């Protein structure tokens, strides 16, 4: 039996540009997507072993209310049916079906022992579970896949469900460190970033609802070709304007300009609200905006923004120092 841990991921800058960059395969005028992402300390802990079927179990107290143990025969037909069902285990079954189809593996039994990652909060809980399943098959059946291979399989498995997340989510495969990711059509490049000073990030689950599938569906409609000015501005926001933001963020991190980095977060959120939020009713996020503008929080932070696909999922701040970070968390 093997013990595994897969972290969630926090997108610091560049949300939605992963799938937008993929449209370069159909429209060369679209710029590559660029995002700065990092794994976080919260994640999924599990024990895995070989089995005859594909099984998911959980002992995690955090999931006891939503969890029902799952078992499926290790056949392409059964696994693909679950993947398309929209059920709680559709993501896991999507990855398992891909592994069976391309690597002719047997089954696995995955027992989640601890879950410190909130669900549906923009921290890639679905991607983390996909990476966990891919890694379990990889290690148990000695497939010799590297981290990028696990990440790609997690993405392709998730594509077998009704979800249409981009490749950015699977950055959790790289562990707890900041990376610059570039998405050029079907190609992905990952570069580790230099961070000169300690950055005191704080992120929080807003404990409200968000509809990621609706958000992604609405934002994908103006691609690959924009038809009006609003759609052109969406292309710019996820393209050239995002490139400038990423360039500044990388510079501020490398030079230790923490205050400027926080201000850039707020600037980025304002751009998102002006040009991206109007493209989907599901992006209206009253709780997020209330928290970002809370006068009690402002003296403790340099800036803040939404997380992941946005909406009322989670919020992230760059605290001024360790003491301010602790006050925010408390």
Where are these regions (language model features)?
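Active-site pocket scaffolds in enzymes
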Residues: 312
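DPxDG-like acidic metal-binding loop motif
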Residues: 122-146
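Beta-strand segments within the central parallel beta-sheet cores of soluble alpha/beta enzyme folds
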Residues: 108-113, 145-157, 263-264
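Short glycine/threonine-rich catalytic loop with a Thr-x-Gly-x-Asp
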Residues: 123-125, 304-307
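Glycine- and acidic-rich phosphate- and metal-coordinating loops
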Residues: 96-97, 101-121
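Secondary-structure boundary elements
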Residues: 99-106, 139-145, 255
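C-terminal nucleotide
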Residues: 1-35, 41-90, 97-101, 152-162, ...
